[in-house]
């Protein structure tokens, strides 16, 4: 085997022998504060299950538990050409998915940048721009036209209420969008109208959430998939429940969606424990919540998602500075800026391979104008490990809760998102947490009964597969939503 270029030296823990007693005391205090024991995780899981159940009840609860109207499992044998449309914050992605029928698929995709003025323009400007992109894509890949309209799955990652899979009423814009005349309206007919104006052979048959897409896409290729999760700027999970277990749908469903029918549920569980009953919040978590745009909401997300990990670190470092332990006689004005430390900070610090943590030294010098001593860097490294590990241990409580609720003893959990994919050692931290919850006597993480595995593309492939399943139901005259819709 030929290795190209220098091999990165292995990460070294480094000795704590040179750390003075007063700083060691602070490190031990932080360990106590941020360590989540196996026992604590089990109590969180128990409460999580009751909150998931509450979300499915008629009364509802903190966790929305939104029915995704995917009422069939993909078999992996589905075939055909399907389109997916993914409307993100800055780009529009169009994906052609050719399902091979043997748990396999091919994809072709184009990305289109959304012009800034569209974010605050008119409803017609937005939908006609999207329709033009679709036309360009179809003309390029089907120059001879198509024999019948292409079914399209639309990944719409904005809060929308759905009574059936081929409709979705926008509740409110997020991600910097503020387009009049869309909130409170069904987005599917708005898009379909512009598609028809340009005579494009496309039918929008499904509106989906990206987490539900992650679940379905991964199940198509891997029959052991039991859940789709996103661990990135936000956190979320989706799984299949059975209709008989969803109390809030009682009496609302047509006969062809029976009590034994599966139903994909988009949990939106970032709002777990908004009452602060079980999550081990520190004073730093309280500050983050109180100074956030929506205090008292998204409690679980604020302790686990990539958006907040750097900020938790920053608040701890500020506290240590104010108490006179670190960065003595230095200008820390940059460190005082809220959210100046994003997740790349703990990520780079945990990835620093050098004994004296040179990369961390550069990071603080270049970005924050702070000179650090080796001893300070050892504390910073320990803090990054504690914050990252706590996030992983809390995150898998959601996974464990769904597995226990559904009685899964073995499962592949299809995971996606920037933290899962890029944060160093995250997969190992999560695997260790699951091992601790269940007390498994298994050494290797690849032998664990429940494993986090890399997901398939949910917003592209997942949306296309859901379009395929929905198209089949519609063609057979079956329902795709509540009675009378």
Swiss-Prot record:
Describe the subunit structure. Monomer and homodimer. The monomeric form is active, the homodimeric form inactive.
Q: Where are the residues of the annotated region Glucose-binding?
A: 151-177
Q: Which InterPro entries match?
A: ATPase_NBD (IPR043129), Hexokinase (IPR001312), Hexokinase_BS (IPR019807), Hexokinase_C (IPR022673), Hexokinase_N (IPR022672)
Alphabetical UniProt keywords: Allosteric enzyme, ATP-binding, Glycolysis, Kinase, Nucleotide-binding, Phosphoprotein, Transferase
Which protein, by its recorded name, is this?
A: Hexokinase
Which Gene3D superfamilies did the record assign? 1.10.287.1250, 3.30.420.40, 3.40.367.20
Signal peptide per UniProt:
none
| Family, as annotated | Belongs to the hexokinase family.
Keyword flag Kinase = yes
Q: Where is this region: Hexokinase small subdomain?
A: 75-208
Q: Where is this region: Hexokinase large subdomain?
A: 209-457
* Any one GO molecular-function label of the UniProt entry: fructokinase activity
Q: What does this protein do?
A: Catalyzes the phosphorylation of hexose, such as D-glucose and D-fructose, to hexose 6-phosphate (D-glucose 6-phosphate and D-fructose 6-phosphate, respectively). Has higher affinity for D-glucose. Mediates the initial step of glycolysis by catalyzing phosphorylation of D-glucose to D-glucose 6-phosphate.
Swiss-Prot/TrEMBL catalytic activity: a D-hexose + ATP = a D-hexose 6-phosphate + ADP + H(+); D-fructose + ATP = D-fructose 6-phosphate + ADP + H(+); D-glucose + ATP = D-glucose 6-phosphate + ADP + H(+)
What PROSITE patterns does the annotation carry?
HEXOKINASE_1, HEXOKINASE_2
Species the sequence originates in: Kluyveromyces lactis (strain ATCC 8585 / CBS 2359 / DSM 70799 / NBRC 1267 / NRRL Y-1140 / WM37)
Which ranges of the sequence are coiled-coil? none
| Gene Ontology CC annotation, any one | cytosol
Sites binding ATP sit at 111
| Top-level class of the enzyme under EC nomenclature | transferase
Task: List where the protein spans the membrane.
Answer: none
Entry's EC annotation: 2.7.1.1
Hexokinase domain: residues covered: 21-468
GO BP, sorted A to Z: glucose metabolic process; glycolytic process; intracellular glucose homeostasis; mannose metabolic process
Q: In which pathway does it act?
A: Carbohydrate metabolism; hexose metabolism; Carbohydrate degradation; glycolysis; D-glyceraldehyde 3-phosphate and glycerone phosphate from D-glucose: step 1/4
């Amino acid at each position: 085997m030929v290795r190209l270029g220098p091999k990165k030296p292995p990460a070294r823990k480094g000795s704590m022998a040179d750390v003075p007693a007063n700083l060691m005391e602070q490190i031990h205090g932080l360990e106590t504060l941020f360590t989540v024991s196996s026992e604590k995780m089990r109590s969180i899981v128990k409460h999580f299950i009751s909150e998931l159940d509450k979300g499915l009840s008629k009364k509802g609860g903190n966790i929305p538990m939104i029915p995704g109207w995917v009422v069939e499992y993909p078999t992996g044998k589905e075939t055909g050409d399907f389109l997916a449309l993914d409307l993100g914050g800055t780009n529009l992605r169009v994906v052609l998915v050719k399902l091979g029928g043997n748990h396999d698929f091919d994809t072709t995709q184009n990305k289109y940048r959304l012009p800034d003025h569209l974010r605050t323009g008119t409803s017609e400007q937005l939908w006609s721009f999207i329709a033009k992109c679709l036309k360009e894509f179809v003309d390029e890949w089907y120059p001879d036209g198509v024999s019948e309209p292409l079914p399209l799955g639309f990944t719409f990652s904005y809060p929308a209420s759905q009574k059936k899979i081929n409709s979705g009423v926008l509740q409110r814009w997020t991600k910097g969008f503020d387009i009049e005349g869309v909130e409170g309206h069904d987005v599917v007919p708005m898009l379909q109208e512009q598609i028809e104006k340009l005579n494009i052979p496309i039918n929008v048959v499904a509106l989906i959430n990206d987490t539900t897409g992650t679940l379905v896409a991964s199940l198509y290729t891997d029959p052991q998939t039991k859940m789709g999760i996103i661990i990135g700027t936000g956190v979320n999970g989706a799984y299949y429940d059975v209709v008989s277990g969803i109390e809030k749908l009682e009496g609302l469903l047509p006969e062809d969606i029976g009590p034994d029918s599966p139903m994909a549920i988009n949990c939106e569980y970032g709002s777990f424990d908004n009452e602060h009953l079980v999550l081990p919040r520190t004073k730093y978590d309280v500050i983050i919540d109180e100074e956030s745009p929506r205090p008292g909401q998204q409690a679980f997300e604020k302790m686990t998602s990539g958006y907040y990990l750097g900020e938790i670190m920053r608040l701890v470092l500020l506290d240590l500075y104010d108490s006179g332990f670190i960065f003595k006689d230095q200008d820390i004005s940059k460190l005082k800026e809220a959210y100046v430390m994003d997740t790349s900070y703990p990520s780079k610090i945990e990835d620093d391979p050098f004994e004296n943590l040179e990369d961390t030294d550069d990071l603080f010098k270049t970005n924050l104008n702070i000179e650090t001593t080796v001893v300070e860097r050892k504390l910073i490294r320990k803090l990054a490990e504690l914050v990252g590990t706590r996030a992983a241990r809390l995150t898998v409580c959601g996974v464990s809760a769904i597995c226990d609720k559904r009685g899964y003893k073995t499962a592949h959990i299809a995971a996606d998102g920037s933290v899962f994919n890029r944060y160093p050692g995250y997969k190992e931290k999560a695997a260790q947490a699951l091992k601790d919850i269940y007390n498994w006597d298994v050494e290797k993480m690849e032998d664990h009964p429940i494993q986090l595995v890399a997901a398939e593309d949910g917003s592209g492939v997942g949306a296309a597969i859901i379009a395929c399943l929905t198209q089949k139901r519609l063609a057979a005259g079956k329902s795709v939503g509540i009675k009378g819709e």
